[in-house]
Amino acid sequence: MRIGHGYDVHRFAEGDFITLGGVRIAHGFGLLAHSDGDVLLHALSDALLGAAALGDIGKHFPDTDPQFKGADSRVLLRHVVSLIHAKGWKVGNVDNTIVAQAPKMAPHIESMRALIAADLQVELDQVNVKATTTEKLGFVGREEGIAVHSVALLLRA
């Protein structure tokens, strides 16, 4: 078995929605990114790639490559899953922590879990998504951006 950890952060920018875990959430800002800015799926992809010793998303989907401009992070995650499967691994479980002062995540958590489970080709009870704030401390507390920590357990297929 292998364990991987992923971390990503994106700052807020102009826009009226963010995408987290594949779910579009109305918000007063968007997230600045080369792709769709789905910080949750980026951290999760890094955790999966790290567990399989396959590098990180920057190696596989560089932000200098125009083909990934505005890319759907669910498509990128599904590609990561194909890479780990090709190396003889399958997902045991994943645990994700969204760190955000706003918007409120609770109404969207179950939708995120369902989409992630589908993309990982696992059962819903193998995917956890939770959210916390920083009690108004730091860049997250000042509502300048969102961070996510992800942990993935891989098992031999």
Curated annotation (Swiss-Prot):
GO biological process assignments: isopentenyl diphosphate biosynthetic process, methylerythritol 4-phosphate pathway; terpenoid biosynthetic process
Pathway listed: Isoprenoid biosynthesis; isopentenyl diphosphate biosynthesis via DXP pathway; isopentenyl diphosphate from 1-deoxy-D-xylulose 5-phosphate: step 4/6
Site (Transition state stabilizer): 34, 133
Cofactor note: Binds 1 divalent metal cation per subunit.
EC number(s) on file: 4.6.1.12
Gene: ispF
Subunit structure and binding partners: Homotrimer.
Catalyzed chemical reaction(s): 4-CDP-2-C-methyl-D-erythritol 2-phosphate = 2-C-methyl-D-erythritol 2,4-cyclic diphosphate + CMP
Gene3D superfamilies: 2-C-methyl-D-erythritol 2,4-cyclodiphosphate synthase (3.30.1330.50)
GO MF terms held by the record: 2-C-methyl-D-erythritol 2,4-cyclodiphosphate synthase activity; metal ion binding
Function: Involved in the biosynthesis of isopentenyl diphosphate (IPP) and dimethylallyl diphosphate (DMAPP), two major building blocks of isoprenoid compounds. Catalyzes the conversion of 4-diphosphocytidyl-2-C-methyl-D-erythritol 2-phosphate (CDP-ME2P) to 2-C-methyl-D-erythritol 2,4-cyclodiphosphate (ME-CPP) with a corresponding release of cytidine 5-monophosphate (CMP).
Annotated positions binding 4-CDP-2-C-methyl-D-erythritol 2-phosphate: 8-10, 34-35, 56-58, 61-65, 100-106, 132-135, 139, 142
Highest taxon of the lineage: Bacteria
Protein name (database record): 2-C-methyl-D-erythritol 2,4-cyclodiphosphate synthase
